[in-house]
Amino acid sequence: MPVSKQVIATEAITRKVDLDNPKVLAKLKKNMGHMTYGEPAWPNDLLFMFPVVILGTIGVIVGLAVMDPAGVGEPADPFATPLEILPEWYLYPAFHILRIAPNKLLGIALMSAIPVGLLFVPFIENVNKFQNPLRRPVATTVFLIGTLVTLYLGIGATLPLDKWVTLGLF
């Protein structure tokens, strides 16, 4: 008797699909009922696998930080100023716009024009309901030009002012 209860309990958890049942076959033809088999996420994944992965990741990060602490860079020297101070890499394009603008107010206006211009892209492309980028030429063109200009300004920010136009290639 306990063996049959064990088998029933196991079948209730795993739920194997009966492919001889015409109702199940009809559901599968309609792409319905495909989640009626397999191991349930609750409680197996949520109570066991997720905490193990999260705690394991935290353990690896803490272990690496304790065993080999990374240096932050050169120690600070308040009496030596670097020749050129650059921001972090993700701020290079904005820094370069400010650097090449003849007037700082114009540089701030140019930086403010970028998000304002991006706000208008959905309204320009509103007539096109496709999700494929090849069928949305305006949004794709704005994305490609914006990416190229951002890369150009980001690379140019690392060069001296007399070489940034050609990116030091010529």
Swiss-Prot record:
GO molecular function, one term: electron transporter, transferring electrons within the cyclic electron transport pathway of photosynthesis activity
SUPFAM superfamilies, per database record: a domain/subunit of cytochrome bc1 complex (Ubiquinol-cytochrome c reductase) (SSF81648)
Hydrolase as UniProt keyword: no
Pfam families xref list: Cytochrom_B_C
Cellular component GO terms held in the UniProt record: plasma membrane-derived thylakoid membrane
Transmembrane regions: 46-66, 105-125, 141-161
Compartments in which it is found: Cellular thylakoid membrane
Alphabetic keyword roster: Electron transport, Membrane, Photosynthesis, Thylakoid, Transmembrane, Transmembrane helix, Transport
Membrane topology: Multi-pass membrane protein
GO biological process: photosynthetic electron transport chain
Record-linked InterPro entries: Cyt_b/b6_C, Cyt_b/b6_C_sf, Cyt_b6/f_cplx_suIV, Cytochrome_b_C_euk/bac
Electron transport among keywords: yes
Function per UniProt: Component of the cytochrome b6-f complex, which mediates electron transfer between photosystem II (PSII) and photosystem I (PSI), cyclic electron flow around PSI, and state transitions.
Record text on subunit structure and interactions: The 4 large subunits of the cytochrome b6-f complex are cytochrome b6, subunit IV (17 kDa polypeptide, PetD), cytochrome f and the Rieske protein, while the 4 small subunits are PetG, PetL, PetM and PetN. The complex functions as a dimer.
NCBIfam families per UniProt: cytb6_f_IV
Protein family according to the UniProt entry: Belongs to the cytochrome b family. PetD subfamily.
Protein name: Cytochrome b6-f complex subunit 4
Organism in which the protein naturally occurs: Synechococcus sp. (strain JA-3-3Ab) (Cyanobacteria bacterium Yellowstone A-Prime)
Gene name per UniProt: petD
